[in-house]
């Protein structure tokens, strides 16, 4: 292990060892994590142990093979990653639909049987497809699978990503496009995964857009901008205000922290701070 990776890993292990009584979060929001917030060197088991000790409720973007590890620590597998395609190849191209319909319907059954509330999906990249045609194709696909999702009580969440910095050519890169798709599908189980980091880069106006389009949002992700690092004052977003705005809308879903610690930082301390910011 390199020295620069060893110290944060050591801090995480120490924090986990010292926390014998789990923190009970008293705020209105249910918070989750992704693997990246723990840095590069922590095992899934250790990250679950630490997350549970800090009052985290769930773990995003984890597949079925690892669900038992999450559940061992009382964590909900909050967002199933994989069956809904990939960022570049997903719902906006009809040639993907047959395979994705099969995998999505199977995943809905699997999620329902295992207490997993949501499945992530994507628009896909534009390539040669125009935005209007891509939206039509996404609507057509989601209309095929929504009844099964509704019957099983599983959310299908399409992620809103930026095409300016991280995901060049991604189609769902403005909130208006995604809201149009959601309105046309019009299902209580088909929603937007509103990634606040990506939204800030593309449209900004975070709180107004969340309030205006709240009925179409099923999950949130966080990350500091610029850089997708910790949520402190080294970045531009006022996450405490954003958290309060979300809670004031009586949001009952999950907020997932999805950032990577800056070099030399203590990931445990940064996660503690993120959880406290959203404990409103």
What are these model-predicted stretches?
Residues 52, 71, 112, 150, ...:
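Anion (oxyanion) recognition and catalysis
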Residues 47-66:
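Catalytic domains of carbohydrate-active enzymes, especially glycoside hydrolases
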Residues 10, 16, 23-25, 90-191, ...:
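Active-site acidic/histidine proton-transfer and metal-coordination neighborhood
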Residues 68-80, 154:
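Short acidic, glycine/proline-enriched helix-loop-strand junctions
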Residues 37-39, 63-65, 83-85, 125-127, ...:
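Active-site-proximal loop/turn and secondary-structure-junction residues that shape catalytic pockets
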Residues 2-32, 37, 41-52, 116-117, ...:
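Histidine-acidic metal/acid-base catalytic patches
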């Amino acid at each position: 292990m390199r020295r620069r990776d060893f110290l944060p890993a050591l801090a995480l292990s120490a924090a986990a060892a010292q926390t014998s009584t789990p923190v009970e979060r008293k705020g209105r929001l249910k918070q989750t994590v992704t693997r990246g917030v723990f840095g590069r060197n922590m095992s899934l088991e250790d990250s679950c142990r630490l997350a549970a000790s800090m009052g985290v409720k769930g773990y995003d973007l984890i597949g079925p093979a690892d669900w038992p590890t999450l559940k061992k620590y009382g964590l909900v597998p909050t967002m199933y990653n994989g069956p809904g395609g990939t960022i570049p190849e997903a719902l906006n191209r009809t040639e993907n639909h047959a395979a994705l319909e099969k995998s999505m319907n199977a995943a809905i059954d699997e999620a329902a049987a295992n207490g997993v509330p949501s499945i992530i999906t994507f628009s896909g990249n534009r390539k040669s497809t125009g935005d209007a045609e891509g939206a039509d194709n996404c609507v057509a696909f989601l209309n095929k699978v929504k009844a099964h999702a509704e019957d099983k009580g599983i959310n299908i969440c399409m992620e809103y990503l930026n095409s300016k910095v991280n995901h060049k050519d991604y189609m769902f890169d403005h909130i208006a496009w995604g809201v149009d798709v959601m309105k046309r599908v019009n299902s209580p189980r088909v929603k937007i995964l509103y990634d606040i980091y990506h939204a800030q880069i593309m449209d900004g106006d975070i709180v107004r857009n969340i309030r205006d389009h709240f009925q179409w949002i099923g999950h949130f992700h966080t990350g500091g901008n610029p850089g997708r690092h910790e949520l402190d004052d080294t970045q531009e977003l006022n996450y405490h205000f954003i958290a309060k705005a979300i809670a004031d809308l009586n949001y009952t879903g999950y907020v997932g922290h999805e950032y990577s610690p800056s070099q030399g930082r203590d990931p445990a301390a940064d996660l503690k701070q993120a959880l406290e910011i959203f404990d409103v």
